[in-house]
Amino acid sequence: MSKEQFIIAMRFLASSVSVISAKDQSGKLYSMTASSVTSLTIDPPSVLVCVNNSASIHDVLTQGKNLCINILQKNQQEISNLCSSKQRESQRFDNDFWDTSHVPFVKKAQSNIFCKVEETIAYHTHKIVIASVESSQSADTFNTLMYADGGYLD
């Protein structure tokens, strides 16, 4: 299968939009829009996130590190766009979208899932991050930002 055929096929996989966020030991904040986030196990609660080796957050996500998976609401496209743009990387936290007092998280997200990295697996161009879920908080109603076929869904 060609790379192009695979990309076209995957464009039909609709998913919620998530932003992964973390803070390094010096307090520097990191975030990225993630297209590959999934639950792994229910007992114990765990998740799997795939991170490109070239992503700035890549080196921060090591064993024992805390991170947050922020599942965005429909009105949070701007956060997704900020966190997916290398050109706007320095602007990602220059707004009031975030609580950065501990592990950074998006305020008013659909859900915030607070995790601890348990294991990472190198696979070609990506790192597979396996994390245990320590806590979560969610909105009362479903209003999740969805993405498919190269754009946000209504």
Language-model segments: what does each one mean?
Residues 1-154:
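Basic, polyanion-binding surface patches
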